[in-house]
Amino acid sequence: MKVDEREITVFQGEYKTSPLIVLNTVQGEGEEIHKITKELSASDFTLLSVQIDDWNSAMTPWRAEAAASWDSGYEGKADEYIKSLTQRIIPGVIVRYSLCPSFIAIAGYSLGGLFALYSMYRTDIFTRFASVSGSLWYPGFAEYTEKNIPSASPDRIYISLGNKEAKTGNRIM
C-alpha cells in the first residue's frame, strides 16, 4: 500500500491492542526483520514498515555536507516526513486495521536511528524509541539534544552504537 508516495507494509499482530512499531527501511527489509523478531520474542506486536527511498533526505533533521566521499550529502527533510508519518501514515494504518495499540514505538538503523531519536523532539506520538547503530555523529545533533526538550515523555529508549565508527579516519564519525 502507498501513502504519501511511500510504500508501507503492515505485519499485523494477533491483537488490536498489540504495540505498533514503526520501522523505516531502505532496502525493504521489514518482512525479514519481522520474521526474525517474531522467532526471537514471545511479545506480540504490529510492525509498520515504511520504505524510505530518499534516505539521506527524509532521515536527516537539517542539511549537512556528505560525511564520506561516496555519499551525496544530506537534505534535512525529517520534519516533512515526521508530518506525513504522524498525520497520515500512522493514523491511516490505525483506522484501516482497526488498531488500538497499547503504545507506538519507532525504530531505525543508521540514519533511521538518528531519525528515531530526533522524532522524540518533534512529536509525542511515540513513547518508545530504538536507535540501532544510529548516526548520532550527525553534525549538530548532540548540541540539538542539549538545547531542546523532548516532545515525548519516553517510556523506554534503546541505543546501540556500532564499533566501526571509532575505527574510521573520518573525524565526523
What feature does the model see in each segment?
Residues L136-M173:
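The feature captures the conserved acid-bearing segment of alpha/beta-hydrolase catalytic domains
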